[in-house]
A protein has these predicted regions:
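Long, contiguous binding/interaction regions
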Residues: 1-129
Length: 129
């Protein structure tokens, strides 16, 4: 992992009705994967995964890519959580996170790693849940 640029996640949430929009956004993002910016675009997950109680897919990217990624996320019409990847998993998903689109999703914070531990680092840029 690079040490000069902070790692970030974006979680794109969808419903049965908005699944096609999520799939289209995912395909657009897959076309832009690059080792210096957008590293990973996960599969559409149709069930609860980690703290995410509704269907979603996630992207891994470096902070420097955020200005290029935000227009796509802001205009997709879906609820999106963008957050840094730090050693405080709870803060990442709450106070450090930024919600776009619809109303924030109530996350299951009980499953997050304790402060000082974040298993997300090991899978950053490689795999989703």
């Amino acid at each position: 992992m690079r040490t000069d640029d902070a790692p970030f996640h974006a979680h794109v949430y969808f419903t049965t009705d908005s699944r096609a929009s999520a799939a289209a956004l995912r395909e657009r993002l897959l076309a832009t994967v690059a080792p210096d910016a957008l590293l990973f675009v996960g599969e559409l997950r149709e069930h609860k995964v980690g703290p995410h109680p509704v269907p979603q897919f996630e992207c891994h990217f470096y902070e420097s890519y955020l200005p290029r990624l935000m227009p796509a996320l802001e205009s997709c019409g879906l609820t999106v959580l963008v957050h840094p990847l730090t050693l405080d998993d709870t803060a990442d998903h709450t106070t450090l996170g930024r919600w776009l689109g619809g109303a924030p999703i109530e996350l299951d914070l009980s499953v997050l790693d304790p402060p000082g531990v974040n298993q997300g680092f090991a899978r950053f840029g490689r795999t989703d849940f």
